[in-house]
Amino acid sequence: MTFALIVGAVVLTALTAYLGWNREIYGRQPVYRSWWMWLGPLIAAVPVALRVLHINWGGPALSVVLLVLASGLMVGYVEELLFRGIAVKMLRAGGRREFSVAVLSSLLFALSHSVNVLQGQELRTVGTTVLYTFAFGALMYLTMRSFRFIIAAMILHGLTDPTAILATGGIDNVSDAAPAGIPAVVAGFTLFFLVPLGIILLLCVRGKAGEDKTGAHVADASVAS
């Protein structure tokens, strides 16, 4: 867990509290949900479950496992707070409909990972990561909207990176050697299912905060069916 990550978490948490945004960010989503939105967290959870089965739990020391998990959960908290919390709140406050909110917040999330090129990563790796994170961002938006609370997206996001690290030894890496076994299944699922389905589901997003499915303004759109 890096010092910068901890500082980022503290700063963002303090900022939202100072601005009085905690209720809007951490509270119940002010927009209705549809049954198909549950596909978002379901799709995102498949790679996590597969990696858990592949992890050699008897390999790394318990302290290493706990540190990786803690770091991953912190990443999930910070990134979701920034992109599904602050960004979504600001986009909704600007009067944008949920399709624009989902697309723009996912795009910002994806572009934030393009800075990896400054660390010397190959363009192919960065490009693949940006495409993946755009689709993943869409799935996290749907996770937040289907569960109705951002904490669900924070937890699912927080488990994604550490399970990848513990199962493969790293993230955002492209190896010349073809993966085998469960890692190959995860890679194939991500390439052929997670990314395209994430984008397809994103295109189906409708609604606007404060409105029910008919477009009528309601006091609490989150309780509308």
Which residue stretches match the model-derived regions?
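Small-polar-interrupted transmembrane alpha-helices in polytopic inner-membrane proteins
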Residues: 44, 76, 98-114
